[in-house]
Amino acid sequence: MEAEAADAPPGGVESALSCFSFNQDCTSLATGTKAGYKLFSLSSVEQLDQVHGSNEIPDVYIVERLFSSSLVVVVSHTKPRQMNVYHFKKGTEICNYSYSSNILSIRLNRQRLLVCLEESIYIHNIKDMKLLKTLLDIPANPTGLCALSINHSNSYLAYPGSLTSGEIVLYDGNSLKTVCTIAAHEGTLAAITFNASGSKLASASEKGTVIRVFSVPDGQKLYEFRRGMKRYVTISSLVFSMDSQFLCASSNTETVHIFKLEQVTNSRPEEPSTWSGYMGKMFMAATNYLPTQVSDMMHQDRAFATARLNFSGQRNICTLSTIQKLPRLLVASSSGHLYMYNLDPQDGGECVLIKTHSLLGSGTTEENKENDLRPSLPQSYAATVARPSASSASTVPGYSEDGGALRGEVIPEHEFATGPVCLDDENEFPPIILCRGNQKGKTKQS
């Protein structure tokens, strides 16, 4: 989940964040400012370690890290049509690609990299950056709203199917085919997100009062939650916990809501044979005769837990993560702060603020800490083939303007392994087939 801050408050270049995003498994936070970008590790409550920082690219408004790998994707306001992919631990640029209009958002998993423009979406194979598909003539999407499942075995993509209604197009990023269309809301979409396995999709409209969860790939509604009654609420972020038990939503208000996804059952338990039980059963039966909007409201679940922010109106994003073996709610704001809360997974209620970190200072820089936590492994054959030397870089062939990509270097295979034991497994991650010469890549369009 990524957010681009609105107007920075007065106070200098680093007075606020231009953008901020949690990585796919909520173990890292990336921030962008007018001065550059930074990456932070989220392994501790008491200490926020800066993994990397760069001032080489100014005025950053998109920064995305691929899990806990060395790959980071950056877009700057100085070149808003150009995407840059870096290997930050080696201090090298892997590739850069230019597109026909400004880049609004980027999503990535270990299989696909998506570049979203206002009226098109480009789907790349992340391992060699070959353009696989260009979705043209999609409804205008001025905010670049889209979601990509982090489960690379399906790589589902979701994006708005209409500018005026809450229709969602579900697309399979592996088979490159449209799966279904979901009529999620009456109003325009404000947020969409997948759970970790790609089996559920949550959405909210611009009104921001109702959040719905659908099954994937059939698009059936599973849950409906009511965030509140206040109108004109802007949902800033919507995210599942990694185990899909919870769904949290932050907005431009001072409250973050956490909903619990209870087990869906086909039959309701019998009410107790008491007067109150009988009246409850009659009340639920009566909702069948009420107008649809009223009946739906009666069946909507309320928040399981909430967190109070000491601000409102600021751009922010939230996530649910397990840090030091306990569930935590994390909220990053455009003012340059990260708030950490404890979440009670059994009883819910009010989340307790336990730590506030500044994201604007120099912080504790530990460039090699993540490497120290992993066993030392030899470089894979795929990496050796892909990068014979720093001065002799293989390139992806150029594409037309519709294809968007102008040039780039093949990405080392070992960056996409799911864990240390697989980094040099050529059966699971075979060597990259290098693209040489001026041969054009075939571009599929729809």
Curated annotation (Swiss-Prot):
Q: What are the ranges of the WD repeats?
A: 3-42, 47-88, 92-126, 131-173, 177-216, 222-261, 304-343
Q: Which Pfam families match?
A: PROPPIN
The GO annotation for biological process reads: autophagosome assembly; autophagy; autophagy of mitochondrion; cellular response to starvation; glycophagy; nucleophagy; pexophagy; positive regulation of autophagosome assembly
> What is known to happen upon mutating T209A?
Loss of binding to phosphoinositides and abolishes puncta formation
Q: So what does mutating S251A actually do? A: Loss of binding to phosphoinositides and abolishes puncta formation
- Where in this protein would one find the motif L/FRRG motif, according to its record? 225-228
Report the GO molecular function annotations. Answer: nuclear androgen receptor binding; nuclear estrogen receptor binding; phosphatidylinositol-3,5-bisphosphate binding; phosphatidylinositol-3-phosphate binding; protein-macromolecule adaptor activity; signaling receptor binding
According to the record, mutating H257A results in:
Loss of binding to phosphoinositides and abolishes puncta formation
Give positions of region: Disordered: 386-406
Compartments annotated for it: namely: Golgi apparatus, trans-Golgi network; Endosome; Cytoplasmic vesicle, Clathrin-coated vesicle; Preautophagosomal structure membrane
Record's keyword annotation contains Calcium: no
Q: How does it sit in the membrane?
A: Peripheral membrane protein
Q: Which domain of life is it from?
A: Eukaryota
Q: Where does the entry say this protein is expressed, by tissue? A: Ubiquitously expressed. Highly expressed in skeletal muscle, heart, testis, pancreas and placenta. Highly expressed in G361, Sk-mel-28, Sk-mel-13, WM852 and WM451 cells. Up-regulated in a variety of tumor tissues.
Function summary: Component of the autophagy machinery that controls the major intracellular degradation process by which cytoplasmic materials are packaged into autophagosomes and delivered to lysosomes for degradation. Plays an important role in starvation- and calcium-mediated autophagy, as well as in mitophagy. Functions downstream of the ULK1 and PI3-kinases that produce phosphatidylinositol 3-phosphate (PtdIns3P) on membranes of the endoplasmic reticulum once activated.
Q: What does the entry's free-text domain comment contain?
A: The N-terminus might form a beta-propeller domain involved in specific binding to phosphatidylinositol 3,5-bisphosphate (PIP2), leading to the association of the protein to the membrane. Association to the membrane can also occur through binding to phosphatidylinositol 3-monophosphate (PI3P).
Oligomeric state and partners? Interacts with androgen receptor (AR) and the estrogen receptors ESR1 and ESR2. Interacts with WIPI2. Interacts with WDR45. Interacts with ATG16L1. May interact with NUDC.
Q: Could you tell me what this protein is called?
A: WD repeat domain phosphoinositide-interacting protein 1
According to its UniProt entry, this protein's organism is Homo sapiens
